[in-house]
Amino acid sequence: CDRRQRQMCIRDRLYNSQESVKQIQTGVVLEWDTKLGEVNSNAYYSNRDFVGLLPFTNGGYVELNRDFSGAEVNIKDKSQNFEWIVGTSIQNQKDDRKRFENNEGYKGAVTLDQIESFRSYGAFALVSYNKENYSIQSGLRFDLHKISLDDNIGIDQQYVDYSKSLKAFSPNVGLIYNLNRNDEVYINYGESYETPSLSELSANPNGVGFNEDLSPMNSSGFDIGFRKKSQNLSYSIAAFYIDTKDEIVRYELEGFEGMNFYRNLGTSKRVGAELEASYNLGKPGVLNASYTQAKYEFENQGVSGGLAGIPKSNFTLEWLYGYKNFDLKMDLKYVNSLYADNNNEVKVPSYLLSNIALKNKFNLTGFFLEVGLHVRNLLDEKYFDNIRTNAFGSRFYEPASLRSFILSIKTAF
């Protein structure tokens, strides 16, 4: 550890900071045709068992067992000018969350024991009217969320149970106009609604129970752009504007280093432009590039500044090359500086990252062999990663990995 990280490394060793995860998941997808149209359905289930040791005593030993399941069914059809799809979905998440004292790596007394449930019901419809030169799309989604908490510990026999229902409509509308066979312009408008997750709600700075001061986010915005596609070149240019109320942001508290808490941050605005392009070089391969330039700002109780954790600009360049059984991928990524805190006092420097990956396939008698080499951070750039916005004790980031090599071998008989 360097000087900046030495104190935290000592705490990590003292409290035996670590985590382990066991997970299973399964799912099924069914499709069939009816007189009304094509029906698509899916169902899924996963279970996640998590144990984490954080570098503090009170609640620093975490056990979480999560059941997550859901299903969706929709039907779609199209005629000469119309396309439509309607559907419904359900999701259910149940978290058995326990926290104990972390007595220097050993499980101590229980500090939190609660069952958290989040059930969502959704219904949606999307219709598109298509003509030769233009297309109009419109959609509407309705969501109903039921959130509950059962406290199993009860401090001084005071059990903190919780139940709440939230609902929202999310409309959207868009227009695409074809200038000619290869060029088109478009404009979209939409509204969205995002409830806090169970993990965000359960991170209550006041102790057990949910953080009832945490509200859902509401966003509205539009984007307008131009797309072109020719034989060798395709590109798109877009401008966007998003207005969000009650932005959810993370922060940390003294004595709970490494644990995330969440709060609402007034209003925020995202205004910017994006450029994406792809060029077919022929035998030399394909070049892909993307660039984003934007402003991400917030205002909260008369205080304004830049949103933490988001760079104002970034650029990516990628080269793909293939010849017979050989494949090569090189990429270059530039990320501008960003603020690590809402006060805009700590700035994380910009960096330039490069990677290269090569692989070759061999068809040998009786079996197939693929050998690959991936070099990450090819130029050995020193930069910071794992950004923790609004962290306590200046623990905003960690040094990222320097140049590393990954050798892979895959075979099939």
Describe each model-derived feature in a short phrase.
Residues 1-10:
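Single conserved hydrophobic/aromatic residue that forms the stacking wall/gate
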Residues 19-154, 228, 233-241, 286-288:
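Face-selective signature of the C-terminal outer-membrane beta-barrel domain
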Residues 26-32, 71-77, 123-129, 140, ...:
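Residues on the lipid-exposed face of transmembrane beta-strands in outer-membrane beta-barrel proteins
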Residues 39-43, 84-88, 136-140, 171, ...:
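Transmembrane beta-strands of outer-membrane beta-barrel proteins
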Residues 64-76, 118-124, 211-215, 221, ...:
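Outer membrane beta-barrel strand-and-loop segments of large Gram-negative receptors
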Residues 78-81, 129-132, 145, 239-243, ...:
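Gram-negative outer-membrane beta-barrel transporters
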Residues 92-103, 146-155, 176-223, 234-235, ...:
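Surface-exposed extracellular loop regions of Gram-negative outer-membrane beta-barrel proteins
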Residues 193, 243-245, 287, 337-339, ...:
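C-terminal beta-signal and adjacent terminal beta-strands/loops
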